Amino acid sequence: MPDYSYRPTIGRTYVYDNKYYKNLGSVIKNAKRKKHLLEHEEDEKHLDPLDHYMVAEDPFLGPGKNQKLTLFKEIRNVKPDTMKLIVNWSGKEFLRETWTRFVEDSFPIVNDQEVMDVFLVVNMRPTRPNRCYKFLAQHALRWDCDYVPHEVIRIVEPSYVGMNNEYRISLAKKGGGCPIMNIHAEYTNSFESFVNRVIWENFYKPIVYIGTDSSEEEEILIEVSLVFKVKEFAPDAPLFTGPAY
């Protein structure tokens, strides 16, 4: 008959020292982490010469002069949980609305200036007092001239409009600005051909929807404008020198 009684001499207790044992996963992760750090340091060395240059985080606030060209102002009613189309340069039906409501009579850019970037700026203000809600916006940059977007869409992953209730979109294409000269003469000849030949040949066409996070229908005053980022050339040397010059 087996003996199940406890005997201290039968059992053995082994204590392993974990000083020389490490988790295999942590070893591999640490090795990869060190490798990535070394590769990152090598990549940063190639960028060291760029430390001597300054750039603006927001291209709208970067070097150059901003020239504003107001397109139109109007009031739109926006229902809750929906966003309304306010800017569409891909569909031809919006062109009539834009040109007939065009505000500016003169072009704010002279002949000798070069356009570096064009921003579409949408400013929104509530028309009713004592309203507490935030503005929402969505946009897309398209090329297809035959595309006609929906007038109203549901709110899906929108962006909250930031400071001063101003929604700003850079229309610059990837790779640089717009080396256009003598644009004042182009604008004076024909505004429609100026937009089609000069602006849309070098910049993207925007589609913009706006909405609110309000649970009621809201009335919004919208101002849409183009802001041209113009390169400022160095002035000519004065004819005279002295304390007044």
From Swiss-Prot:
InterPro entries: Polyhedrin (IPR001746). It comes from the Viruses. Signal peptide: none annotated. GO terms for molecular function: structural molecule activity. The keyword Cell wall biogenesis/degradation does not apply. Keywords: Viral occlusion body. Transmembrane segments: none annotated. The keyword 4Fe-4S does not apply. GO terms for cellular component: viral occlusion body. Pfam families: Polyhedrin. Major component of the virus occlusion bodies, which are large proteinaceous structures (polyhedra), that protect the virus from the outside environment for extended periods until they are ingested by insect larvae. Belongs to the polyhedrin family. This is Polyhedrin.
